[in-house]
Amino acid sequence: MGKIIGIDLGTTNSCVAVMQGTQPTVIENSEGNRTTPSMVAFTKTGDRLVGQAAKRQAITNPKNTIFSIKRFIGRKFDEVPNEKKIAPYEVVNEGGEARVKINDKTYSPQEVSAMILQKMKQTAEDFLGEKVTEAVITVPAYFNDAQRQATKDAGRIAGLEVKRIINEPTAAALAYGLDRKQTSEKVAVFDLGGGTFDISILELGDGVFEVKSTDGDTHLGGDDFDQKIIDFLADEFKKQEGVDLRNDAIALQRLKEAGEKAKVELSSRTDTEINLPFITATPEGPKHLVINLTRAKFEGMCSDLFDKILEPCRRAVKNSKVEMKDIDEIVLVGGSTRIPKVQALVKEFFGKEPNRSVNPDEVVAIGAAIQGGVLKGDVTDVLLLDVTPLSLGIETLGGVMTKLIDANTTIPTRKQEVFSTAGDNQTSVEVHVLQGERPLAVDNKTLGRFHLGDIPPAPRGMPQIEVTFDIDSNGILNVSAKDKATGKEQSIKIESSSKLTDAEVEKMKEDAKVHAEEDQKRKEEIEVKNSADSLIFSTEKQLSELGEKIPADKKPVIEGALEKLKDAHKNGTIESIKGAMDELSKVWGEVASNLYQAEAPGADAPEGQAPQDGGSKKGGEGAVENAEYEVIDGDGK
């Protein structure tokens, strides 16, 4: 008997998860992403593209690229006038049903949805290494029977036996683990996705969860916010240039992508610039679209959508017979809940901060996987002695990951290491906490970042910054950085640091093997450049300090070698940098031996090394590793 997978068939993105032992795992697709665009495209050569591949070519192939098909599934043609109007692909009436016409062939929404489900099925099969035939698929709580049945039909077309169709808010409640709490609680699940909105009030206790009421709007979601921006951009451009971009399918698709991007940016910024060069052309020449959009403007033009969100909330609370003050938690689900105004409305309406503990893009699929585990009988309460599956460390100079805790270390565990600054008078350091096996920080998973400031100005290599990693028996990672001179400390708590999917773990390990040679070369380049930088710094410092003590005939030679190294460091190859370093070290070594003899800082340095202030060696007592801060003790690495 194979696994029962859980699929969130979303309007904008879809996600698939499965139970691995007692834990749900979100499965990465073939592109390495945890969510897959719910898009299907047909090329001129007859190829069918699904997911990210379809999204990448949407701008150049808008009429043959299908998105937001969930808005059509289970609906009659006359029920989707607005959706039909804004879709760049052709929607036709076939027996009263909405169909999509591509290259003289019509497809039902169920068929298109099945193509997306097949992609999710294949993703799961690639991950599990076995055939998958059963699934739990989620739908909006406010989906009607026709939409539910159509979704089930899509599963059948995709070769899946749909064991259960469950509501997205119910799945979200499972995923958040709220049903496992011992005390009775009342919870509101607020689900605003790409095309639909649900609000459900649930009562949970003793592993039983009961839906008290549900409400929503199957015509309200992130697509509608995107459309507001699209209309704004089209209207502004028409005012400026007298051209309506809505009549150009390719321009319209570019507006759609720009609108979605602007919406996302406005979740973290107060304004954004939409810049679309060569958006169209007139007899006068090419035209470019450059428009600034503020968050306030965005919120103003979406005010009617925000109002539409509140009404279902009022109805749901009223119908649940639950007093507002008795609702214990508000769970946010769906990517559109990242919009700041939405979060503010939720807080204002319910009178408390919403729960943001799980990724809103993945929570529904996780819940579906848990439901699959329940149906399979695999979900049981198991206590495990855990280990950290991947190495933990921080980013150091040149983007290198310096490990503090190795993979498969039994927890609880604690590790300390001392670092220093990499620049003179550096008054703060950023601690970038990483997890993974790759040598470079960029290739590993970021767990968090924090800053330690107010470090007294001092030459580089002098301050001592003690970084501590502490993982308790619950798998909760605490990272702290302390300036040993001042006692000032900063810390960050990273919960579930080991909560990577098995897919992520295996992908990182495989990447580490496949890219080992490339990684090693890149790491060597960084190390050589770091060494060259240190040699340049120490040479300039010694030239300045020693001044006239350096023989007149030797000083130009040293300066020439120094300039050669600087040029190689800036423009040369690794081999040329090494050669220039050797040349400078040799020249400097001759001078240093005459000046300092045995007691000189660099007299006994190994070949290729010059006297260094702080250095970049690693391993022995007192060694320092150049970082944004530098290792200066011998513990561990």
Curated annotation (Swiss-Prot):
Pfam families: HSP70. Transmembrane segments: none annotated. Induction: By stress conditions e.g. heat shock. PROSITE patterns: HSP70_1, HSP70_2, HSP70_3. It comes from the Bacteria. The modification Phosphothreonine is found at T196. Signal peptide: none annotated. Keywords: ATP-binding, Chaperone, Nucleotide-binding, Phosphoprotein, Stress response. One of its GO terms (molecular function) is ATP binding. Residues 598-637 are annotated as: Disordered. Residues 627-637 have a biased composition (Acidic residues). InterPro entries: ATPase_NBD (IPR043129), Chaperone_DnaK (IPR012725), Heat_shock_70_CS (IPR018181), HSP70_C_sf (IPR029048), HSP70_peptide-bd_sf (IPR029047), Hsp_70_fam (IPR013126). Belongs to the heat shock protein 70 family. Acts as a chaperone. This is Chaperone protein DnaK.
